[in-house]
Amino acid sequence: MALVAQLGQGRGGLYSYESLENLAGCEIHNTERILPEHQNLQPGNLIRLGPQGYPCFSVVSAEPGRSLVLISADIKTGMPISFFSAPEKGFSIATWQFILEPAAENATRLLVRERLVYTPDLSWVWRLTEPVAFVMERKMLLTIRRLAEAGSRIEEI
């Protein structure tokens, strides 16, 4: 879970196609090592997908070695977005969950679930972006798997 705990811009990166993320101005720099300074996530911490003004998530819960749950955050305030106070148009909210489950002796399965709710006027946006998000998230998971299997070690900085 150490690799997942450090997800985000200005942290460990997103472990995906860095050059594509940066074409979109995300300023992502992926690392292949565990960064001790990004391992202690707390509820309310912000996980950015790019610089100020880009989408971001707020940590809902973080159990080291077990789970990480994120929810969309307001790009201006960093506060979690509430579905119950949403406007009727131009609104979306996402949750992103990472769960580690024992799979076998010396093996772990990383489960990822994303949920997205949006107003009907934004349905066309998500029809365009969901396939791209799938490709990027698949690359992220493959990279996390490769790094975990290689036994990424903690390096003191």
Model-derived features: where do they sit?
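Hydrophobic ligand-binding cavity/cleft-lining segments
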Residues: M1-P43, L147, I154-I157
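Hydrophobic pocket/interface hotspot
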Residues: M1-V4, V59, L110-V112, I144
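Residue-level marker of positions within ordered structural domains that often coincide
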Residues: A5, Q9, P64, E105, ...
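Residue-level preference for alpha-helix termini and adjacent loops
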Residues: Q6, L14, S19-N22, N40, ...
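Structured surface interface patches that mediate subunit assembly and partner/cofactor docking
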Residues: S19-H29, K76, R115-P120, T129
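A contiguous catalytic/ligand-binding core that recognizes phosphate-bearing ligands
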Residues: E37-P102
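Aromatic-glycine hotspot motif
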Residues: F57-E63, N106, A148, E155-I157
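Beta-strand/loop substructures that line and gate deep hydrophobic ligand-binding cavities in soluble
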Residues: M79-R138, L142-R146, E155
